[in-house]
Amino acid sequence: MTTPFARFDDRARRSSWLVWGTAVGVYFLALLHRASLGVAGPDAVARLDISATELGAFVMVQLGLYALMQVPAGLAIDRWGARRVLLVATLVMGSAQILFAVATSYPVALAARALLGVGDAAVFIAVLRIAAMWFPHRQYALLTMATSLVGAAGNLAATVPLVVVLDEFGWTRTFAITGATSLVYGLLLLRPAVSAPFRETAPSASEETGTEPSEGDPPARPAPRKPSVRETVANVPASWRRPETRLGFWTHQATMVTGVVVSLVWGFPYLTEGLGYSSAAAASQLSVYVVALLVFSLFIGPLAGRKPTWRTPMGLLAALACAGAIATLALWPGGRPPGSVVTAVFVIIAMGGPASQIGFHLARDYNPAVRISTATGLVNAGGFTGAMVTAIVVGVVLDISSGGTAATLTDYRWALGAMALLAVGSTVAMFGSLLGVRTLVLERMARGERVIVRVTEHWWDRLYRRVRPPGR
């Protein structure tokens, strides 16, 4: 006999939106945990008696392991599925936050942030995997945007609300509560869902070459069996060989690094120690960043989905704007920009978060479904590798400039200058990769092949071919 509860459970198990909603809840928690050190940085310095370099090392280790685990996480999702990986990730993140709550020494706290980076690594690409497998292709841009919005909400919760909770309950109880929340939420992931309606298939000839399918292409073959470990590992070089995957890697790095480094670790100390803001005012400024990120997500995500030809120009514009905004803070006469300028800079760098999603569109469109998670992991690694390097460089520059004493505004200007230079370097790499991809697309079009996104030849394409001829 079928009970009403059983019928409800069956409908719920078949709901694509319920599956995505459960998964994106993990992403909300992941962003809350990831950004929690942003406003707790000064408290960490006082509690653990650490320097600016050691504070930067928290982010370096957390983001470094996050970046390092991107490819293994993608392989695990391709091999065992998103639900199992999300369950493990949720439990690991919760345990890491509880360990961070009780840490009273720097090594223990560092180990906790490292564990958090490992748990966090798989969450976003698992949610994107669910979006790709549970929804039709036309809804992918919408789901990517919605995922970013939920993540931004988690980031927002790690600003003013977290400051209030820290002031009210203190370090230990605050981080213990957030960790316990993740552990309890993991219970929702114990029940497996039915098979995804848009399951992965083996790649067709057109998927392997990055062209649109032609009438003579055989249809993609169903791949009901789980890929072997060898086949899964082989996805890594196969994904990286795609020039569009490499373009996604650099796009993600060039657009997102400044926002991540500012929001996760160095924005709050710059505002409080460098510009003399109160903790509440600095947290409010970070909230402006998150709100701007939410607003930009409403526009950039849909545009990237509906206007494929606009994707890389939008990404390049966002990367240049972010680098220029950070340079403005570093080079402002006297070093103390007015509040309106600081707010404008935080709004501009928020553009990079939604723009970084363009890298995932490239991974999604130019890799067969059996490699989506691996390619997405490679793209995601680009941004967080850059963020790791930038965070530690800022800390080192601060320590060198300040001589180990309390950092001044001048010290922060040097550090921001270093951040701007690194952002420019990533943008140059993105532009070079973009020119290479455009050259390949123009060659395919000249041969009469159909391509996923058509391009129009410009003078810079001809100049690039002269400087770096095809085949080199």
Feature locations, PLM:
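Juxtamembrane intracellular "pre-TM" segments in multi-pass secondary transporters
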Residues: 2-12, 196-249, 448-468
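Helix-breaking motifs and short loop linkers at transmembrane-helix boundaries and internal kinks
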Residues: 49, 81, 102-108, 119, ...
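Conserved MFS/SLC helix-loop-helix module at the cytosolic interface between two early adjacent transmembrane helices
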Residues: 68-107
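Helix-to-loop junctions at the C-terminal end of transmembrane segments
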Residues: 69-81, 296-310
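Cytoplasmic helix-loop-helix junction between adjacent transmembrane helices
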Residues: 112-151
